Amino acid sequence: MQVSVENTSALERRMTIAVPAERVENEVNKRLQQTAKRAKIAGFRPGKVPMTVIRQRFEADARQEAFGDLVQASFYEAIVEQKLNPAGAPAVEPKSFEKGKDLEFVAIFEVFPEFTVAGLESIKVERLSAEVADSDLDNMLEVLRKQNTRFEAVERAAQNDDQVNIDFVGKVDGEAFAGGSAKGTLLVLGSGRMIPGFEEGLVGAKAGEERVVNVTFPEDYQNLDLAGKAAEFTITVNSVSAPVLPELNEEFFAQFGIKESTLEGFRAEVRKNMERELRQAIKTKVKNQVMDGLLAANPIEVPKALLENEVNRLRVQAVQQFGGNIKPEQLPVELFEEQAKRRVVLGLIVAEVVKQFELKPDDAKVREMIEEMASAYQEPEQVIAWYYKNDQQLNEVRSVVLEEQVVDTVLQKATVTDKSVSYEEAVKPAEAPAAAE
């Protein structure tokens, strides 16, 4: 077999393969012999059909089948021989497939980039440290109470944080518009759920009162037909209800699946959850900085095939998450390219770090991570057992642990500065990660 390889770009390869005619004919004959054993042709007993007849009837199909199998087999043999690592399936261009001649074809494909991870010493990481103070715990308890607010009808003017039941009709240029009218809508004033000016126009209103509120739709409003336009809403207030926060009692504690019947016990459970979230937030911020540093220090070219696959995967995820009747391929590629490229590049870099430093998932850390996740459930031992009985779930945890070991490896060489901050600052969502160049 003859093989020649041309580098048509940094990652694209054009491989020409010639399979000897003798091997081709052997493959064709092999298929014809198999066909002869089972062929049923009028006038002949099964298995006794002359080969000349078999050739007349089935050689074209046998040759086509042999072509497909030989292309696949010889391509694999060629990439092993040439020590190439394709990043996707090849595009095959037949050149010659005549009887009695060599089978010749061209395979065009991309290879994975070859590189060594560098610049670890140039990476700078700010590692936060924080504690859950009593004031943080008090604030969290208030958040939990507000999340479980109930409303009771009152006979007074509406104010911010009250819930109003309203009917409304909206008009633009004197004409009602689609989606601009509703009845029995519940709205918490000050929630920012409606466009600017709508909720403010209801402060001070009482049950049974009708108000006319003039607003302007934002320039970036999702409905382009309404964006930037002035509108008039006629609003009828059906009722006004004031918020009532629940008491911190056993009934309230039970809503969170916590068996503790005392405030002290509930506070201890909430603190435990906050500390777990704090550890995860700090870990995530460190990881993001490490990944950003790896990206900046290791600019690599991405195989188009990998990028296309990742974009398609993100499209499918988006459709599954947001639903609707749209098909994944209808979503614009541009929406996902940046995220897809970051994921692909980081995947290649992380894999190279694993290879370069000979990393393997630490079983003790895998167990520790599973126990940490299980601690958030009422029956942690059952959760732990479930993970170890499900290979797919266990492998996902092992992958996360391996990625954490990559982060730890980088931190050993990076410049790390520690900074003490408040709980709020530590758990505040990080800025969007940097894009791959």
Curated annotation (Swiss-Prot):
It is an enzyme of class 5 (isomerase). It catalyses: [protein]-peptidylproline (omega=180) = [protein]-peptidylproline (omega=0). GO terms for biological process: 'de novo' cotranslational protein folding; cell division; chaperone-mediated protein folding; protein transport; protein unfolding. Gene3D superfamilies: 3.10.50.40, Trigger factor ribosome-binding domain (3.30.70.1050), Trigger factor, C-terminal domain (1.10.3120.10). Keywords: Cell cycle, Cell division, Chaperone, Cytoplasm, Isomerase, Rotamase. One of its GO terms (cellular component) is cytoplasm. Its main location: cytoplasm. Its EC number is 5.2.1.8. It is found in: Cytoplasm. The keyword Cell cycle applies. InterPro entries: PPIase_dom_sf (IPR046357), PPIase_FKBP_dom (IPR001179), Trig_fac (IPR005215), Trigger_fac_C (IPR008880), Trigger_fac_C_sf (IPR037041), Trigger_fac_ribosome-bd_bac (IPR008881), Trigger_fac_ribosome-bd_sf (IPR036611), Trigger_fact/SurA_dom_sf (IPR027304). Residues 161-246 form the PPIase FKBP-type domain. GO terms for molecular function: peptidyl-prolyl cis-trans isomerase activity; protein folding chaperone; ribosome binding. Belongs to the FKBP-type PPIase family. Tig subfamily. Consists of 3 domains; the N-terminus binds the ribosome, the middle domain has PPIase activity, while the C-terminus has intrinsic chaperone activity on its own. Involved in protein export. Acts as a chaperone by maintaining the newly synthesized protein in an open conformation. Functions as a peptidyl-prolyl cis-trans isomerase. This is Trigger factor. It comes from Pseudomonas putida (strain ATCC 47054 / DSM 6125 / CFBP 8728 / NCIMB 11950 / KT2440). The gene is tig.
